[in-house]
């Protein structure tokens, strides 16, 4: 009997050791040197919820060359930063109840922060928390007139202060997209540096357009340029931008519902690669033969210099 108990304890210890080693090896590999990880969102075509996607379902191309997917896994934990442009018309606060519902519908593995874009900076109102009711309490009326700024500089400020992480990271920007510091003629000069920073840090930037308090934002061409910059920012970071014409949306709910589905169908793709002697960006493409499924992903990734 004693011998059987001893053997059982040894077997249990070996099993636990194998589990711990396996988990550690997976985590170490995902964040190890010579590897790059990017977030991929599976999207069901024609509003169909996408099925689960396995590593074998994915074809990955780096600079047009088929490249092996080293690791493909569900992104369980998410850090979602909500950045609200403080120059928005105060009527946007009519949408806050829907935004609160979106917060509260997120799983406990989602950590939400709330910040306001003002004077080229991200003013933090609530740090990351999975207490979604607490995050919702940070929603307030925007300042409106007099708070004109650059949402792109505020995004850069937010990302520069965001610690590195192997988990999924997204930003939801609610803004007109108008750059009152440097203009949108024809595009804000800070858009490129913003999406490149996001690509380096593997951050998706989603956006919802809302008009700001300045009457000039209601002019078609100015609003159109702002929307174009928001759309480009989303496209370059593997996300989407939501708007309906240049007027204020009647409701954020359809956008937030779609965003919730996207966030629930994200994966982390890891591949082996580096930039050689000098860091660089490389174009990527991700496809699948699964029916009714397509991917949202950044069109290029950052390859750090070889160590």
Predicted features, each with a name:
Residues 1-8:
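N-terminal secretory signal peptides that target proteins for export/translocation
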Residues 29-307:
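Scaffold/interface architecture of coatomer-like assemblies
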Residues 11-24:
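Bacterial N-terminal signal peptides
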